[in-house]
């Protein structure tokens, strides 16, 4: 009888030990925190589980063996859903499985900023931050049928883009991104801003065209309103804008220096040859340049040229003779700088 009781006791202890081991293993995979930091995972189509796991650095993993065992047991390559995922601090290994299997994506910041004046470069800027291919982005920016749904054309699509930081899913389509841009565009064009544009005799798209020239003329934002005032004065007086950046646009921004011969390039974008505004923006205008056109300085200036101080500012003039003096002053300063080898 005692022997039988001993056997039962030993068997019970073995069951407890086994259950404890199984329970401990379950706890390690399903409840015990296994990450000491965050990691970004980017899952592309056709990726394998091993390729995804390789994106999690050892430095934030408490138990790599546990992570590999749990994920490989519960997740097949075919279960992976493309997207951007974030491994959070203090999460258990099984969280990675659930996140990837259920497609619990985390949005990314799509940053549209800096100089954006060529569709190819804009396409690369977007593609570098998204799962999209740059050719797919470029095609969308030239797709008349797609853009007409937003009220734009390939010629004026730069007007639609409002530089900012946008939260989007990494797997977003170009239509998703354009939807975001249209929402931002509509948000910018409040009743107040529409009234300001109308007061200047401009449509919103025309404001973008002038703003693109203003932005292309200077990197010094405090001068934007003064430069905008010059171009609006010329426009209202029926003068040709004679904006050098429009010539640079005609040559695909390949010129190091604009010469007199370049001013003869026959294009509706060449404001030396054609009166009024070009057909579309010559770059993506930012909010400061748009606001400068809506709130221009009130002055009588019709000309401006680079300041002889070479500090990125400009000198403004109301008459052509005054402008020529400023231009000669700048040329002398430029010649002196070249002579000194600076």
Where are these regions (language model features)?
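N-terminal start-of-chain detector that recognizes signal peptides
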Residues: 11-16, 58-59, 82-84, 136-141, ...
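Bacterial extracytoplasmic/cell-wall-associated proteins, especially those involved in peptidoglycan
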Residues: 48, 131-135, 146-342
